[in-house]
Amino acid sequence: MGANENVRRVRESRGVTKSFMARGLGLSLQGYSHIEEGNVRLDVERMKKIGDLLHVDSAIFLNDELTESAIKPA
């Protein structure tokens, strides 16, 4: 999976809405949706901000195994 898909998976596992993410990133809801759909490439700064909003290390978005560990219940 790509980083965009991993962002969606982590966001959903945390129960965070797209609207919350959009506001936190200073984007419209449609703009944020484009990120999760893979229509927008994620740069390092945006990944860091997304990680901050979801309270995770942004590196997990680049690695499927780390993403899995982040979405599994503790």
What are these regions (language model features)?
Residues 26, 45-60:
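DNA major-groove recognition helix of helix-turn-helix/homeodomain DNA-binding modules
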Residues 12, 23, 52:
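Alpha-helical residues within the helix-turn-helix
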Residues 6, 17, 43-46, 57:
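Residues that mark the N-terminal boundary/hinge immediately upstream of a DNA-recognition element
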Residues 15-34:
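Short alpha-helical DNA-recognition segment
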Residues 52, 59-74:
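Short, charged recognition helix plus adjacent turn
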Residues 1-13:
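A short, Lys/Arg-rich alpha-helix, primarily the initiator
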Residues 39-49, 68:
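Short, basic-rich loop-to-helix N-cap that marks the start of a DNA-contacting helix
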